């Protein structure tokens, strides 16, 4: 009887922890979409040019600079909060509090009339959100006690992130029509308020309860020592680390550029707000979740190595379909096919590459190592989104997406070398 009760308690704890990861992922997806879709869409409606819209994406630069402050999150304990709630939860609370303050400030401006102030506040929001992401990434790696739990943690986080993107897109579009943009941002703030409550409800990972941290600000020497040890540890386990990083940098190019330029393209092709909300966002999210779930099943059967290759190849179909759509013009059937292909590829490749990132990290420097790896992926997305806006201004849409496809193919020869020499993929046979 006692064993059954203990088993039920463990099930409840696991259930709470996974739901918590899902909700935090939702907040992360919501704030991410605020920068990459909501504000760009509002600016598109106001007839701003693609180069200005693409430049707003630079406000998300903190997402690719997580490595700069991840050593502090690994080694520095915030007085009172970390001792009271645990190392990871203490940092999560701080990031949530400042995120809420930044979101509150965003309510007092009109992005269309205050571009510079908008960019500054979005930069602050992305800094807070990326800090939360560092903590969440470490939490979902440290908390699981088995390979199956690791897969579930990333799956729930991925689903939550995409639900947040749905709220930040479909919810944004409909709310802006019915209630106006100010109500949209008020709703986003209200959802963000859930974050601190979730953090208080989940448990601190056991591995962090005995983690060697300090309440004194680490000096520059200690700071760089943490980064150095993190990189050396990665390099010791993963030969030719720079080649792997370059591969990661290019891997998401076929997805990041179409995502950033989708709003201007769809508006240029005269798709209505209703069509974009229902087909591109609502239907697209469902397909993305299917792609992510299938990648987990495939990884369990074929291993991470082959799943990553499949994900990278099928991603090339995404810009190709946008090229076809841009050539044909307004056509609902082609639009649905394009959305299906893009979102399935994004869900599949996005989930499997995240699991691969986690497999590269060791327990001592989880936050720093994962940030180092993920930063290069984010760098690809953010820089290419910004440059994509400039290129789209001078190229026709079909030529633009053809160039996107050709550029994205550069990952193939790099992956081929990795495949031939088995570089980096120490866990080729690892099943997750």
UniProtKB/Swiss-Prot annotation:
Protein's membrane topology: Multi-pass membrane protein
Keyword Transmembrane helix: yes
Membrane-spanning segments: 17-37, 52-72, 90-110, 115-135, 150-170, 177-197, 241-261, 285-305, 308-328, 335-355, 372-392, 395-415
Gene: ampG3
A single MF term (Gene Ontology): transmembrane transporter activity
GO cellular component terms listed in the entry, alphabetical order: plasma membrane
Tagged with keyword DNA damage: no
Protein known as: Putative transporter AmpG 3
SUPFAM superfamilies tied to this protein: MFS general substrate transporter
Localisation per UniProt entry: Cell inner membrane
Record-annotated disulphide pairs: none
Record-stated family: Belongs to the major facilitator superfamily.
Keyword tags: Cell inner membrane, Cell membrane, Membrane, Transmembrane, Transmembrane helix, Transport
InterPro entries in the cross-refs: AmpG_permease/AT-1 (IPR004752), MFS (IPR011701), MFS_trans_sf (IPR036259)
């Amino acid at each position: 009887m006692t064993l059954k009760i203990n088993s039920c308690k463990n099930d409840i704890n696991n259930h709470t922890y996974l739901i918590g990861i899902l909700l935090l992922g939702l907040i992360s997806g919501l704030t991410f979409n605020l920068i990459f879709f909501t504000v760009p869409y509002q600016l598109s409606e106001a007839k701003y040019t693609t180069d200005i819209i693409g430049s707003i994406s630079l406000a998300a630069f903190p997402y690719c600079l997580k490595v700069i402050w991840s050593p502090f999150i690994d080694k520095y304990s915030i007085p009172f909060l970390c001792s009271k709630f645990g190392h990871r939860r203490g940092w999560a609370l701080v990031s949530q509090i400042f995120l809420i303050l930044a979101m509150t400030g965003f309510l007092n401006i009109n992005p269309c009339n205050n571009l510079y102030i908008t960019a500054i506040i979005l930069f602050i929001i992305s800094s807070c959100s990326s800090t939360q992401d560092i903590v969440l990434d470490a939490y979902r790696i440290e908390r699981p006690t088995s390979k199956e739990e690791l897969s579930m943690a990333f799956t729930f986080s991925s689903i939550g992130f995409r639900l947040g993107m749905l709220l930040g897109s479909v919810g944004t579009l409909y709310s802006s029509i019915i209630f106006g943009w100010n109500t949209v941002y008020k709703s986003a703030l209200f959802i963000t308020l859930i974050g601190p409550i979730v953090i208080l409800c989940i448990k601190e990972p056991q591995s962090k309860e005995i983690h060697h941290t300090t309440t004194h600000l680490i000096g520059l020497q200690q700071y760089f020592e943490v980064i150095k040890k993190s990189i050396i540890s990665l390099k010791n386990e993963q030969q030719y680390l720079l080649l792997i990083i370059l591969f990661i940098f290019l891997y998401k190019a076929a997805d990041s550029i179409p995502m950033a330029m989708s709003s201007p393209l769809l508006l240029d092709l005269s798709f209505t707000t209703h069509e974009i909300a229902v087909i591109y966002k609502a239907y697209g999210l469902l397909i993305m979740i299917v792609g992510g779930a299938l990648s987990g099943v495939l990884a369990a059967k074929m291993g991470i190595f082959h799943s990553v290759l499949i994900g990278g190849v099928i991603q090339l179909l995404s810009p190709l379909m946008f090229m076809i759509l841009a050539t044909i013009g307004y056509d609902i059937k082609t639009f649905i096919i394009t959305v299906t292909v893009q979102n399935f590829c994004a869900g599949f490749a996005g989930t499997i590459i995240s699991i691969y990132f986690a497999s590269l990290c060791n327990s001592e420097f989880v936050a720093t190592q994962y940030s180092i790896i993920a930063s290069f992926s984010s760098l690809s997305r953010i820089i290419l989104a910004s440059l994509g806006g400039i290129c789209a201004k001078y190229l026709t849409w079909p030529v633009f997406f053809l160039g996107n496809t050709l550029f994205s193919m550069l990952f193939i020869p790099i992956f081929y070398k990795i495949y031939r020499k088995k570089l980096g993929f120490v866990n080729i046979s690892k099943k997750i």
